[in-house]
Amino acid sequence: MVGADLSGIELRMFAHYLSHYDHGRYGEILLNGDIHQVNADKIGISRKLVKTVTYAFLYGAGDEKIGLSYDPQLSPAKAKQKGAEIRQAYLDAIEGLEKLVNEAKEKVRTDGYLRAIDGRYIAVDGSHKALNYLLQSGAGCIAKRWMVIANENIKQLNIEAHQLGFIHDELQFECNPAHADTLMFNLELAAAQAGEYYNLRIPIAAEASTGTTWADTH
């Protein structure tokens, strides 16, 4: 078996959209530094916590949930207050983030939809979901295009392989053992090609591995 996962696809989509406002700064740190540590230093919380806050923020968590991630013992009111403070500190720490969020929310409030990276209309039933829908739709488009390109390359290169699964941002194949290395290279290359297909402003990458079971390649 050969499997591959897209590398940090949500944060790469985040960097892609932020580049309109920060001239690629977030993406540069994401690729070449430690973006969670940089944000932790700015906000004044631990790296572990800022990572939790980042994904809570991107997935649309409310203030109370963010506050409880900081301290599970807080009352609902205190958690909501603390979460609001952390949210604002997070917005202030990342150049262009507040503008990105506000513009996405305004688009949803005005039109009721967003446009994905492939041009499709995405109906959004609440402005607080705008950023999450933007990033998740982008990640989904990239993952599906990655699968298409990978399979096209497999045919062109005459790799003896058969796709077993497509799980979120992961592809799994069975293949001739002699073709495993070529297939791994192809899956990593196809991820980069998927990003180029949509003219993303940050490169897309994947990490491939081989083994005899899904436990080895997942």
What does each model-identified segment do?
Residues 1-218:
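Conserved catalytic core of nucleotide polymerization and phosphodiester-bond processing enzymes
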